[in-house]
Amino acid sequence: MTSSENLDSHRLRLDVVTIFPEYLDPLRHALLGKAIEDGILEVGVHDLRNWATGGHKAVDDTPYGGGPGMVMKPEVWGPALDDVAAGRVSGAELDSASLHLKNVRHDELGGVEKRAYVVEEDRDLPLLLVPTPAGKPFTQADAQAWSNEEHIVFACGRYEGIDQRVIDDAANRYRVREVSIGDYVLIGGEVAVLVIAEAVVRLIPGVLGNRRSHEEDSFSDGLLEGPSYTKPRTWRGLDVPEVLFSGNHAKVDRWRRDQALLRTQAIRPELIDASLLDSTDLKVLGLDK
């Protein structure tokens, strides 16, 4: 049985509006490319300049009130989002960069557990994600929720961003989320799209194959993931922890939990919620006093 014969019926459509369509080529590679090939994922990339007018196909103009930089024009973005929401355009449909069908991962052979689509009140509207430093921080919880979506549209801003009226008006046709991937500024939204798309798509049943691969990820249980090891047993004088060879699954699980707790305490202590920890967890962290 191939992985594609064992999949849930859920499919995701991604549409990306950008002035640099070639920037999205990485979506054709690796596991996302395989998801496209397996029919789990569809990706359409739309050049914003197709909606621009005039000889220069300008998509930006000077900001009202003065100040540096340029602002992306509403009369270009508005029609673009209208058409994408209505399915009136067919951008460059991305295909897989290389064939993957004969390269089934060993952890896909065990099958994929199905997951129901999460129904929301406004589920008939596509989800519009606008990457911006001013947006709400993107989290693993967002990725998990959005992996249940059927249609996500990304609006990639550049320069000083998109005229705010575009975002406000889009709420008539979309569920709009302005989202940030970190407290720093990028040149444009395309990099953020690659980050969000990969985080979301990998959670769709059939993409990773082994459901435990993402259940044990960092942040999936509120903690950072602990260290991982593979062959050889000793490398450059460094040994793999003995507990991993014990064959005692309970001890291995406890060790991994302890490592996740200690790593989180050292690197991201703000993620630890003592109210969610049991007595053993608290003892590991020295919080049982």
UniProtKB/Swiss-Prot annotation:
UniProt entry tagged with the keyword S-adenosyl-L-methionine: yes
EC number annotated for this UniProt entry: 2.1.1.228
Function: Specifically methylates guanosine-37 in various tRNAs.
Oligomeric and partner information: Homodimer.
BP term (GO), one: tRNA N1-guanine methylation
Name of the featured protein: tRNA (guanine-N(1)-)-methyltransferase
UniProt-listed HAMAP family: TrmD
Keywords: Cytoplasm, Methyltransferase, S-adenosyl-L-methionine, Transferase, tRNA processing
Catalysed reaction, written as an equation: guanosine(37) in tRNA + S-adenosyl-L-methionine = N(1)-methylguanosine(37) in tRNA + S-adenosyl-L-homocysteine + H(+)
Main location: cytoplasm
Top-rank taxon, per record: Bacteria
Compartmental location: Cytoplasm
NCBIfam families: PRK00026.1
Enzyme kind, highest EC tier: transferase
Binding site for S-adenosyl-L-methionine: 157, 181-186
Keyword Transferase: yes
Annotated source species: Corynebacterium glutamicum (strain ATCC 13032 / DSM 20300 / JCM 1318 / BCRC 11384 / CCUG 27702 / LMG 3730 / NBRC 12168 / NCIMB 10025 / NRRL B-2784 / 534)
